[in-house]
A protein has these predicted regions:
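Low-complexity, disordered linker/stalk regions enriched in Pro/Thr/Ser/Gly
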Residues: 1-440
Length: 440
């Protein structure tokens, strides 16, 4: 078998006849005479034949001597066996099954196939007319001697070039990134190189860029728009406060080498542990792009946001991201949630208006509760119209870690970092009637 990419072939036929001498040579293509030429002084003739894509292109030749005897084509010279001339202008076809990969093409035009673990790539090579000549597969520059299933890649070249010229037009292999170590953060460059019998010097390649990535996306920023933010010592504590509806804004990243964010799932859980229905937001972010979602939260919510993100190859966090506590309470609700109790010391004496009357300094016991939002500050004052010099006032504050500014006041109840109950004594030193104690 002879192979060519040319539409026409030129060759010279030489013969001998020691008795009467050779007059002419006739060329046949698939048994049909194409041309007859007289021989030159060396008994040779040169022919140009147009090849057909739809025929076998078997070339034979016959010689006619000077007395008119013609020899049968099949019995003449090196073409006696009816050698085929395979005309093939096609190139090898290399196909790879990459449907199970996430694929992305960057701004530079480089296409990368992302995987979570070592996936199998099934590929086929084909040269329909002239047949395959060789195949070579490299991953990160390392030539594979066999595919994932143990099929030899080295023997393939030998079989394709078999001396019997048994044409192999198609072959299949299965490879995996597990066969070679990754470069950098999980990069693999797979090159499949194939040549055909029509021109074994021409090598045709298919390059596949694969990136293996097994890291789940992470939350890189969390904000509650419309709420004040306080520093917390523990993520289970409350740190965002507002008296209106707010919006939580969450940024999620899969890093510079990740596959990109596919979706984010979240649910709200209140302080009692009741979970709302989980919501999944489809993000479809490409590699290198952050995903930002906004979650509206109505006032009167007290609790946490739980969140998980999934990237484009299926990496997902084992545990939910838990936000800092969010506490929302409308002003009108605060009035019903708080409770202030003021108790003067007991006495059997009263003034003309029925108010308690004391012969000496006294004090007032104060108990304050806010089981929902907690206590952030206490403003108190003692005022009398006839002894203004002893009028007094003060402010007691509670920080976001639950520490109280005046040790004379005692914490009676708490909810994480929220101080929900306090008690204290307010001294009264006035020598006056109509003394008024205010607590806010």
């Amino acid at each position: 078998v002879y192979y060519t990419r040319d539409a026409k072939v030129t060759f010279t036929v030489k013969t001998t006849d020691e008795q009467s001498g050779v007059k002419s040579i006739t060329i046949y293509q698939d048994g049909v005479a194409k041309a007859t030429k007289n021989v030159d002084s060396s008994n040779s003739a040169t022919f140009t034949i147009a090849l057909s894509d739809t025929a076998e292109n078997k070339i034979t030749a016959s010689a006619t001597d000077k007395v008119g005897n013609t020899m049968a084509p099949e019995n003449y010279g090196s073409f006696a066996n009816g050698a085929k001339l395979v005309h093939d202008i096609t190139v090898p076809e290399i196909k790879a099954d990459l449907a199970h990969f996430y694929v992305d093409t960057n701004m530079e035009g480089v296409t990368t196939y992302y995987e979570k673990q070592d996936e199998t790539i099934n590929f086929s090579i084909e040269q329909k007319k002239s047949g395959l000549n060789s195949v070579n597969v490299t991953i990160n520059g390392t030539s594979l001697t066999e595919d994932k299933n143990g099929k030899s890649l080295t023997d393939a070249n030998r079989i394709y070039k078999d001396v019997q010229q048994e044409m192999t037009t198609k072959d299949t292999f299965a490879i995996s990134t597990s066969q070679v170590s990754a470069v950098g953060d999980g990069d693999y460059e797979i090159v499949i190189a194939v040549s055909a019998n029509v021109d074994e010097k021409d090598v045709y390649t298919k390059t596949i860029h694969v990136h293996k990535e097994n890291q789940a996306p992470v939350v890189t920023d969390f904000q509650v728009i419309g709420a004040s933010k306080e520093t917390v010592s523990d993520t289970g504590n409350y740190g965002y406060y507002a008296n209106t509806d707010v919006t939580a804004e969450i940024t999620v990243s899969d890093g510079n080498t990740g596959a990109g964010i596919q979706s984010i799932s979240y649910h709200l859980t209140d302080a009692d542990g009741t979970e709302e229905k989980e919501v999944t937001v489809e993000c479809r972010k490409r590699p290198g792009e952050d995903a930002v979602i906004r979650i509206p939260i109505q006032a009167e919510f007290k609790g946490y946001i739980y969140l998980k993100a999934t990237d484009n190859v299926g990496n997902v966090s084992l545990d939910y991201y838990k936000s800092v506590g969010i506490l929302l309470e409308r002003s009108e609700a605060h009035e019903s949630n708080r409770n202030v109790v003021i108790e003067p010391e007991k006495t059997d004496t009263t003034d003309g208006k029925g108010n308690p009357l004391y012969a000496s300094d006294t004090s007032v016991a104060v108990s304050i509760e806010d089981p929902y939002a907690g206590i952030r500050s206490i403003e108190w004052s003692v005022n009398a119209p006839y002894d203004t010099g002893n009028n007094r006032n003060g402010i007691v504050t509670v920080d976001n870690n639950g520490a109280i500014s005046d040790e004379a006041w005692k914490i009676t109840t708490a909810d994480r970092n929220l101080v929900t109950g306090v008690s204290g004594q307010i001294p009264v030193f006035h020598n006056s009637n109509d003394i008024v104690v205010n607590v806010k």
